């Protein structure tokens, strides 16, 4: 018989840098997860993606065992990396802080495709372009 899921915990953690300190420790402690076991396994799985923020969905079972799924980094993080900026615009409608090319948007959309609710790459690109515009980026050809 399959294990019964007791709790689901969603976190965004820097790749390879999960520690028992807040915010990871308290979130996992409340769910009753072995914190050191999770941090070691997460850091081992994400060591090759250093510098990225990785969303993770942790399923906690009744016997306090767990497993987790790592997702692709958020579109905003990938866009900031592609544009080479620290943060987006505080007023995106009036102040543009950077620009990204359609080729960069396509590359990000292809990376994000497994996690996006998009039927094809063009609709995924439109989602990424919308995120870019809301961050104060211009999309150029």
Curated annotation (Swiss-Prot):
Per the similarity annotation, which family is this? Belongs to the universal ribosomal protein uL11 family.
Give the CDD domains listed for this entry: Ribosomal_L11 (cd00349)
Superkingdom of this protein's organism = Bacteria
Q: Which PANTHER family match?
A: 60S RIBOSOMAL PROTEIN L12, LARGE RIBOSOMAL SUBUNIT PROTEIN UL11M
InterPro entries, per the entry: Ribosomal_uL11, Ribosomal_uL11_bac-typ, Ribosomal_uL11_C, Ribosomal_uL11_C_sf, Ribosomal_uL11_CS, Ribosomal_uL11_N, Ribosomal_uL11_N_sf
Q: Which organism is it from?
A: Streptococcus thermophilus (strain ATCC BAA-250 / LMG 18311)
Q: How does it assemble?
A: Part of the ribosomal stalk of the 50S ribosomal subunit. Interacts with L10 and the large rRNA to form the base of the stalk. L10 forms an elongated spine to which L12 dimers bind in a sequential fashion forming a multimeric L10(L12)X complex.
The reply on keyword Lyase is no
What name does the UniProt record give this protein? Large ribosomal subunit protein uL11
Q: Which GO terms describe its biological process?
A: translation
What post-translational events are described?
One or more lysine residues are methylated.
Q: In the UniProt record, which is one GO cellular component term?
A: cytosolic large ribosomal subunit
